[in-house]
Amino acid sequence: MGVTLDSALNPHKPEGFGEVVAPDPDYFKALQAEVNDKGFLVTSAEELFQWARTGSLWWMTFGLACCAVEMIHVNMPRYDLERFGAAPRASPRQSDVMIVAGTLCNKMAPALRRVYDQMSEPKYVISMGSCANGGGYYHYSYSVVRGCDRIVPVDIYVPGCPPTAEALLYGIMQLQRKIRRIGTLER
């Protein structure tokens, strides 16, 4: 295709950046030996479920303020969140991830808890932005909850005011890594 990865062609590229790293050959040799020996792979059902969960995160929006614009931005073609297996859903019963974005008021807190309770297990929460994380700019207001973690358990915090689409994308990838590492989170 005419693609070269030679660093001499681009003198502005930092050393070690963008280099192609070969996969670990011992891993593939062991995998090939197991398939050749038995004809199939052996794994636990829990590891299989963890792998499947990371590739099919269905999230629901709980956009309360300006952070919701960045949440919409991450679905546009530039970032295309669906290529990571995350797709938006309108119903909490179909979702397993809730992204709380924006200022959570005291009047909205029961609705947040009700939506969280309607989600099926396992369920995960991403708190997006300074207002959702700790009240943000409105922290000292009488009507603002100082962090959505006082209402629902939060798995991933995405900082920023508002956080960029890249930050939310990174937070979702961190949630996928956490699911792979921990499995079904016990609450």
Swiss-Prot record:
Signal peptide boundaries: none
GO cellular component, one term: plasma membrane
Xref: InterPro entries: NADH_UbQ_OxRdtase-like_20kDa, NADH_UQ_OxRdtase_20Kd_su
Co-factor binding details: Binds 1 [4Fe-4S] cluster.
E.C. number(s) listed in UniProt: 7.1.1.-
Subcellular location: Cell inner membrane
Keywords: 4Fe-4S, Cell inner membrane, Cell membrane, Iron, Iron-sulfur, Membrane, Metal-binding, NAD, Quinone, Translocase, Transport, Ubiquinone
GO biological process annotation, one example: electron transport coupled proton transport
Transmembrane domains' residue ranges: none
GO terms assigned for molecular function: 4 iron, 4 sulfur cluster binding; iron ion binding; NADH dehydrogenase (ubiquinone) activity; NADH:ubiquinone reductase (non-electrogenic) activity; quinone binding
Pfam families xref list: Oxidored_q6
Membrane topology field: Peripheral membrane protein
The protein's enzyme class: translocase
Role summary: NDH-1 shuttles electrons from NADH, via FMN and iron-sulfur (Fe-S) centers, to quinones in the respiratory chain. Couples the redox reaction to proton translocation (for every two electrons transferred, four hydrogen ions are translocated across the cytoplasmic membrane), and thus conserves the redox energy in a proton gradient.
Subunit structure: NDH-1 is composed of 14 different subunits. Subunits NuoB, C, D, E, F, and G constitute the peripheral sector of the complex.
Family: Belongs to the complex I 20 kDa subunit family.
Stated name of the protein: NADH-quinone oxidoreductase subunit B
Originating organism: Rhizorhabdus wittichii (strain DSM 6014 / CCUG 31198 / JCM 15750 / NBRC 105917 / EY 4224 / RW1) (Sphingomonas wittichii)
Taxonomic placement: Bacteria, Pseudomonadati, Pseudomonadota, Alphaproteobacteria, Sphingomonadales
